[in-house]
């Protein structure tokens, strides 16, 4: 028997997590093959010109990846139903992102980062690894908002957990514009898409799909018991 409290990842969360990773990779990277030669739009508004480049926020921007892993694992361990619901919401959000990335490909003008210093080096590293496209909606903001909304539903953690995640979500959203990886409209788009995904997942109980697939897989792979035939003598 497996002790659920000792498991880092509950068995029921395996499928949602794998689907999440695969779908995220496909949506974010494969869409670029279709939009590479398409015209890209800059959604910058006047407000963006007043937002300065602040290199220290690159630390929060990079740490967000670790924070998401923690956030998703926490609500995955909360319960099967919450795990299924929120991962289904995440799938819906990424699907919306796919259509946005292909239909309205976006770009922006990045900051001229001065050379020298660890923070500037980290920022340039982020710039070199991540092209200035697939910006609207902001996946950074979307994932962070899902983690915050998931934290509100978690009962097995400290009462301060959701408040901490709210602050983290705000800081991560701020980091996207202070590091000049996104514009303000991308933040709004990310939060709105997150709310749409959460609403649709709960409204239509989309998380049940994971249970259906899981049970069918178990039924197919489970070895059948041999039955001994009784031969009746005449």
Ranges and model annotations:
Residues 32-46, 76-160, 208-225, 232:
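Membrane-interface loops
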Residues 22, 60-67, 139-143, 188-192:
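Membrane-embedded alpha-helical segments of multi-pass membrane proteins
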Residues 69-73, 141-161, 165, 191-201:
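Membrane-interfacial alpha-helical segments at the cytosolic side of multi-pass membrane proteins
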Residues 111, 132-136, 171-199:
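Interfacial helix-loop-helix junctions of multi-pass membrane proteins
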Residues 25-26, 94-102, 167-178:
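Aromatic-anchored segments of alpha-helical transmembrane domains
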